[in-house]
From Swiss-Prot:
Isoform G2P plays an essential role in viral DNA replication. Binds the origin of replication and cleaves the dsDNA replicative form I (RFI) and becomes covalently bound to it via phosphotyrosine bond, generating the dsDNA replicative form II (RFII). In turn, viral DNA replication initiates at the 3'-OH of the cleavage site. After one round of rolling circle synthesis, protein G2P is linked to the newly synthesized ssDNA and joins the ends of the displaced strand to generate a circular single-stranded molecule ready to be packed into a virion. Isoform G10P protein binds to double-stranded DNA and prevents hydrolysis by nucleases. Additionally, G10P is an inhibitor of DNA replication and may have a role in the transition from semiconservative replicative form DNA replication to single-stranded DNA synthesis in the life cycle. NCBIfam families: rep_II_X (TIGR01629). The lineage of its organism: Viruses, Monodnaviria, Loebvirae, Hofneiviricota, Faserviricetes. Belongs to the inovirus G2P protein family. It catalyses: ATP + (deoxyribonucleotide)n-3'-hydroxyl + 5'-phospho-(deoxyribonucleotide)m = (deoxyribonucleotide)n+m + AMP + diphosphate. Keywords: ATP-binding, DNA replication, DNA-binding, Endonuclease, Formylation, Hydrolase, Ligase, Nuclease, Nucleotide-binding. This is Replication-associated protein G2P. The keyword Membrane does not apply. Transmembrane segments: none annotated. It comes from Enterobacteria phage M13 (Bacteriophage M13). GO terms for biological process: DNA replication; rolling circle single-stranded viral DNA replication.
């Protein structure tokens, strides 16, 4: 699906001026004039107050703002123009969220996604929209996202952990951008950035953030979004999903042969898809091809102890003063269990204080795990090919209850 679309709409020629900067001719617009014509607010780096009461401002700029839609927001920013940046308005959003309130799955229709951004932008800011040469709109970035499905969240987490050490060729893991449920490759690349992450974890985080807001302070689209995200069927579909996201930038789009002009790209996509192919899926495959070669022949040690974790959590939990359930103690016991699996019963017994070891063993036995089982845990039969869990099935990216979204204007 198209998970992010970044478009740049240049200003009409009559508003664009030029100045010489060294040997470069720089195109720019007068931001104060744009603000007057469109009613937009600007920020000033310097404000000077004179004794006669006059104010002088300099260093005008426009910060990113968010336009509300039915389900989500569209970010936009006015760029004055610079050596490497033609004066324009940049708009960006997740078309999936704008169209349906979530990005667990979604459309690969470039025309529909573009329409969702442009029409909402035009409807919200008609005066600014009229100052732009919409026909010259260019694509700055497309995020193409597809998912592999692990048997459960426990195994999906192990896949992410294994991927942290996978690199190939020019595709390098960006360790500073790796989180517990996310791995990033080539974060600073001007061509494409690749990301793998757990969708169910992200979805739960979004629900938690929205639910923590007082109802009176929630916008109408946040309330709609929370309603959509709380759908049990959606949460069930997201469970076990390992997302592979390609953040594809202009240089990589051009190397694939995609025109950067939005409307030329839409025509290109229509012709391309009419041949029984899918442009967005092939862009995604092209982006991940080098990394996926590293998966060939690779294997990982998989353990499926979700039932054990459930048993431990059902026995060892506490209720905090705020009324929330804490599984801190259960996590320690499960970590001990994983040590038994990886190092063996006798080895762990030799490296822990005797009283602590028996206390942890007793805690696991209380959960219904026989001591004889704890003494004979092994990982030797759990080595499986990595590609078994990195199988992205294009035909099963959406549930059977999916319908192509219909555009709603806020």
């Amino acid at each position: 699906m198209i998970d992010m679309l970044v478009l740049r709409l240049p200003f009409i020629d009559s508003l664009v001026c030029s100045r010489l900067s060294g040997n470069d001719l720089i195109a720019f617009v007068d931001l104060s004039k744009i603000a007057t014509l469109s009613g937009m607010n600007l920020s000033a780096r310097t404000v000077e107050y004179h004794i006669d009461g006059d104010l002088t401002v300099s260093g005008l700029s426009h910060p990113f703002e968010s336009l509300p839609t039915h389900y989500s927001g569209i970010a936009f920013k006015i760029y004055e123009g610079s050596k490497n940046f033609y004066p324009c308005v940049e708009i960006k959003a997740s078309p999936a969220k704008v169209l349906q309130g979530h990005n667990v799955f979604g459309t690969t229709d470039l025309a529909l996604c573009s329409e969702a951004l442009l029409l909402n932008f035009a409807n919200s800011l008609p005066c600014l929209y009229d100052l732009l040469d919409v026909n010259a709109t260019t694509i700055s970035r497309i995020d193409a996202t597809f998912s592999a499905r692990a048997p459960n969240e426990n195994i999906a987490k192990q896949v992410i952990d294994h991927l942290r050490n996978v690199s190939n060729g020019q595709t390098k893991s960006t360790r500073s951008q790796n989180w517990e449920s996310t791995v990033t490759w080539n974060e600073t690349s001007r061509h494409r950035t690749l990301v793998a992450y757990l969708k169910h974890v992200e979805l739960q985080h979004q629900i938690q953030q929205l639910s923590s807001k007082p109802s009176a302070k929630m916008t109408s689209y946040q309330k709609e979004q929370l309603k959509v995200l709380s759908n049990p069927d959606l949460l069930e579909f997201a469970s076990g999903l390992v997302r592979f996201e390609a953040r594809i930038k202009t240089r990589y789009l051009k190397s694939f042969g995609l025109p950067l002009n939005l409307f030329d790209a839409i025509r290109f996509a229509s012709d391309y898809n009419s041949q029984g192919k899918d442009l967005i899926f092939d862009l995604w495959s092209f982006s991940f091809s080098e990394l996926f070669k590293a998966f060939e022949g690779d294997s990982m040690n998989i353990y499926d102890d979700s039932a054990v974790l459930d048993a431990i959590q059902s026995k060892h939990f506490t209720i905090t003063p705020s009324g929330k359930t804490s599984f801190a103690k259960a996590s320690r016991y499960f970590g001990f269990y994983r040590r038994l699996v990886n190092e063996g019963y006798d080895s762990v017994a030799l490296t822990m204080p005797r009283n602590s070891f028996w206390r942890y063993v007793s805690a696991l036995v209380e959960c219904g795990i026989p001591k004889s089982q704890l003494m004979n845990l092994s990982t030797c039969n759990n080595v499986v090919p990595l590609v078994r869990f990195i199988n992205v099935d294009f035909s099963s990216q959406r549930p059977d209850w999916y319908n192509e979204p219909v555009l709603k204007i806020a």
